[in-house]
């Protein structure tokens, strides 16, 4: 089973206003600088949690920051490393997985404090128990549910042999569905963006209605005012690429790149990170589409066309066999 890790940078603004990075970080166009500051913030927050383990705002801030940092500043750059840096790429992905799991651990502890029994439902993956716990949640819990689900699935995507996480997928779906029920407009369509990748990445029958992918894409764009690159990249990667829809892939990535980050200054960092991803995908488009050439596509029938063969760089007379 293959699970695609989600473009979680689209949800970064959820906690930025309350954490030490604040507006300065969100309005930055320098991800490298911001990425270097986050480990220090996390270290300070961990120390604060030791003294104030029941501080709900601090729990949410720290747990979500771990998940965001792992995705946007560790795994994201690792995914774009060249193949010859395999060892470094794997090391960075291992580091990202550890950060995902630490974030989930912190958030789970926070939700267990609010709703005793949550930890048991999460750890067992029991769908009915999870539904019972979710009935007690309120709108303010949508952030917890979003980040726990996203962090868990991203960690699983980096090690699909983690059967303990794999058995939680149905329970995680219950959690994200509840988050959407509680706050469908959460963070400018972040859950709609999530659903695009969630439904597209998992096998038919394991998760909900895949026919809703296009509708969630439409809603993600609508709720973000068309100012976030994330939904276009999500659709390109999770729908166009698997369907070998070259034109759809290219079109959506170009739409992502056409967004002016200065039109939504509060999400400038988000769009800067996502647009780097879009450029990388376009620059490496030949890796994702069968039959893609530098100048043109070669249709299936053309491979056996006599005229095409005559124009090829070899002919039968030049081939010798010992």
Give the positions of each predicted feature:
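Bacterial N-terminal signal peptides that target proteins for export
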Residues: 1-7
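Gram-negative outer-membrane assembly/targeting C-terminal domains
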Residues: 275-277, 284-322
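Short coil/linker segments at helix-helix boundaries
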Residues: 22-47, 51-52, 65-181, 190-223, ...
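Charged, well-structured binding/catalytic surfaces in domain cores that contact anionic ligands
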Residues: 186-187
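C-terminal motif of bacterial Sec signal peptides marking the signal peptidase cleavage site
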Residues: 15-18
């Amino acid at each position: 089973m293959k699970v695609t890790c989600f473009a979680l940078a689209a949800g970064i603004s959820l906690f930025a206003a309350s954490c030490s990075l604040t507006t300065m970080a969100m309005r930055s166009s320098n991800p490298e600088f911001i990425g270097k500051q986050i480990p220090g913030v996390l270290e300070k927050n961990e120390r604060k949690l030791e003294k104030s383990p029941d501080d709900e705002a601090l729990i949410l801030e720290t747990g979500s920051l771990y998940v965001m940092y792992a995705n946007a500043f560790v795994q994201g750059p690792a995914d774009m490393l060249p193949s010859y840096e395999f060892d470094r790429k794997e090391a960075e992905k291992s580091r990202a997985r550890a950060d995902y799991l630490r974030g989930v651990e912190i958030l789970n502890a926070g939700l267990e404090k609010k709703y005793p029994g949550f930890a048991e439902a999460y750890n067992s993956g029991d769908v009915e128990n999870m539904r019972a716990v979710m009935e007690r949640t309120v709108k303010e819990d949508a952030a917890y549910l979003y980040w726990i689900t996203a962090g868990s699935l991203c960690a699983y995507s980096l090690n699909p042999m983690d059967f303990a996480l794999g058995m939680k997928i149905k329970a995680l779906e219950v959690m994200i569905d509840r988050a959407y029920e509680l706050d469908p407009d959460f963070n400018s369509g972040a859950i709609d963006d999530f659903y695009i990748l969630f439904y597209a990445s998992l096998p038919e029958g394991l998760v909900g209605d895949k026919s809703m992918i296009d509708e969630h894409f439409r809603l993600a764009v609508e709720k973000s005012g068309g100012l976030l690159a994330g939904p276009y990249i999500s659709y390109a990667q999770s729908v166009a690429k698997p369907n070998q829809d070259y034109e759809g892939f290219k079109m959506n990535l170009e739409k992502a790149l056409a967004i002016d980050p200065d039109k939504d200054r509060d999400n400038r960092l988000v769009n800067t990170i996502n647009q780097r991803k879009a450029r990388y995908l376009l620059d490496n488009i030949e890796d994702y589409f069968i039959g893609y050439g530098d100048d043109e596509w070669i249709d299936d029938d053309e491979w056996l066309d006599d005229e095409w063969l005559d124009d090829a760089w070899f002919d039968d007379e030049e081939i010798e066999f010992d």
